[in-house]
């Protein structure tokens, strides 16, 4: 027996070497080697020489196809004939199974070596399998599908399509075998099948989901990619079989084919309304490109759930909040207030995006929506105001006034948010707010200085014009809130009322001593004479700032350098070196 096994092994090794040298002659070499193996003397009856021959033929076929993948069909056919002629096959040996294994190996190796011809080779192998004696090829076909999915996932779709076309009854089993063997190939496999044999798409996708529930979404996505017209039917069937996966299915379909996402998700939501918000949220998170279309469709079908869906989608993906808000305005404007409040309650960034989209969609209703949002989340007042200013700039001033009236405590945040979003319009917006609510001027001024320092000068000018009596107090509040903006603020308040230049400068310096130099520089922008008076008064009140005042004014207006230096030095002789 040992001698027989050694002889058979030696023969197989020689055959392998010969095939490596001349792949095209693989079948002929196999035939000659089988004759040699048949002539090995003194082989015990219990030794399975037929099995050795079949295994050798399988290995030779695989090796030959790897070397010449274009000849795969011819090699497999010729090798099948050689295997059919193997003598003395025992009843226990599964020659049909060995032939099927050889065929599967050939298909797999060919798919790896030449992906472009994978479908053609798979079709030829299915024909070869059909000629294998015996009627139990189902398991072998499924094994072949699994083997290909593992080794050549990129060709899985094309190969499954060909295999399903050749044997429709096995489509589901082959699809689930592929998905189970390589989950990453589930979507491409279903796409190929759905394109090649559309009528089998739903059945095969369902088979995948039954075998591997976690792949339901990928199966649905495959159908959507390969045959969009069947996407809704497949998604419904899969969600019906596995309700817990509804959101995943909706998201995968939307990601695979955004164009059909709204139609598919709407059909699923109609079948299972309780899961609509979860589906919408999953789409927003995993397929944001389809979020607005899906939201519009779902909300137009069920306006009463618009707020819930909007909130769920914005929470799942804050970056999609603007699109979702736009969908609310288009599909369910009657739910806009509730939806706006629900979205604002999530976080400030969502509130800003939603406010912007809603204000742009309906500027006339922006004030009411902003008020509803601010009531839901007062801490987001600045972001809501900024969003409104972005979305409806022409109505920003009126909306700012109404927001401050609705919540006076938020006046600073509203002013700051508006000014930061639209610095060029800050003057008009802040002026309107100051005129409407004189008692809140200081708060308004503070908000702008802190959140939009670049707009502080324009805002101060507008406030001084709207309420001259409160201008100096407002300027002082702004300087205290943001000393770095003091120069623009001082220039604006003094330009608005030159007669009170000295009073304004000293009041601001008292509120923000560290900004004395900037205040003097601001005064110098308007009137150098006033700047000297203001600088002198500030330095007398705070001699330690003399050097800072001199340097800041000189940097702003070099022509005044000598004069301001002299004045400061005379006020503080001991600090002349510092000056």
Task: Give the residues covered by each predicted segment.
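General marker for long, soluble alpha-helical cores
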Residues: 1-579
């Amino acid at each position: 027996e040992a001698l027989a096994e050694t002889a058979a092994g030696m023969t197989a090794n020689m055959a392998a070497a010969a095939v490596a040298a001349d792949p095209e002659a693989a079948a002929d070499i196999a035939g000659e080697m089988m004759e040699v193996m048949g002539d090995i003397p003194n082989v015990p009856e219990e030794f399975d020489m037929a099995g050795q021959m079949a295994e050798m033929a399988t290995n030779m076929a695989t090796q030959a196809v790897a070397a010449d993948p274009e000849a795969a069909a011819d090699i497999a056919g010729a090798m099948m004939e050689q295997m059919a002629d193997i003598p003395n096959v025992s009843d226990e040996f599964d020659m049909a199974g060995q032939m099927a294994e050889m065929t599967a190996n050939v298909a797999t190796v060919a798919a790896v070596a030449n992906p472009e011809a994978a479908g053609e080779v798979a079709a030829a192998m299915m024909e070869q399998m059909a000629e294998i004696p015996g009627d139990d090829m189902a398991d072998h076909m499924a094994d072949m599908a699994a083997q290909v999915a593992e080794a050549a996932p990129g060709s899985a779709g094309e190969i499954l399509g060909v295999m399903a076309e050749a044997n429709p009854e096995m489509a589901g089993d082959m699809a689930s075998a592929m998905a189970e063997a390589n989950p990453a190939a589930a979507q491409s496999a279903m796409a190929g099948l759905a394109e090649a044999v559309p009528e089998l798409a739903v059945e095969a996708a369902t088979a995948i989901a039954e075998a591997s529930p976690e792949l339901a979404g990928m199966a649905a996505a495959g159908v959507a990619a390969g045959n969009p017209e069947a996407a809704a039917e497949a998604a419904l069937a899969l969600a019906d079989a596995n309700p817990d996966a509804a959101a995943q299915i909706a998201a995968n379909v939307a990601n695979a084919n955004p164009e059909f996402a709204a139609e598919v998700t709407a059909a699923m939501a109609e079948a299972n309304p309780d899961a609509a918000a979860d589906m919408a949220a999953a789409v927003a998170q995993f397929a944001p490109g389809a979020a607005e279309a899906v939201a519009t469709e779902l909300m137009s079908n069920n306006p009463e759930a618009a707020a819930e869906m909007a909130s769920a989608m914005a929470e799942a993906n804050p970056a999609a909040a603007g699109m979702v808000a736009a969908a609310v305005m288009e599909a369910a404007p009657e739910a806009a207030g509730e939806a706006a409040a629900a979205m604002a309650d999530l976080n400030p960034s969502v509130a800003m995006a939603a406010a912007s989209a809603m204000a742009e969609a309906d500027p006339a209703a922006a004030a009411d929506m902003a008020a509803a949002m601010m009531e839901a989340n007062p801490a987001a007042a600045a972001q809501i105001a900024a969003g409104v200013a972005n979305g409806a700039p022409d109505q920003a001033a009126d909306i700012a006034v109404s927001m401050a009236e609705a919540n006076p405590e938020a006046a600073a945040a509203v002013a700051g948010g508006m000014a930061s979003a639209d610095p060029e319009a800050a003057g008009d917006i802040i002026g309107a707010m100051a005129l409407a609510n004189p008692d809140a001027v200081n708060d308004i001024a503070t908000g702008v200085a802190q959140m939009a320092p670049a707009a502080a000068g324009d805002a101060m000018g507008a406030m001084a014009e709207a309420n001259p009596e409160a201008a100096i107090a407002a300027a002082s509040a702004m300087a205290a809130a943001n000393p770095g903006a003091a120069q623009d603020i001082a220039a604006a308040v003094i330009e608005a009322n030159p007669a009170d230049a000295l009073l304004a400068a000293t009041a601001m310096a008292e509120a923000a001593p560290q900004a004395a130099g900037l205040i003097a520089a601001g005064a110098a922008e308007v009137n150098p004479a006033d700047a000297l008076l203001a600088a002198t008064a500030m330095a007398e009140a705070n001699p330690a700032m003399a050097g800072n005042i001199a340097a800041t004014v000189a940097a702003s207006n070099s022509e005044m350098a000598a004069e301001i230096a002299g004045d400061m030095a005379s006020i503080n002789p001991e600090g002349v070196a510092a000056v």
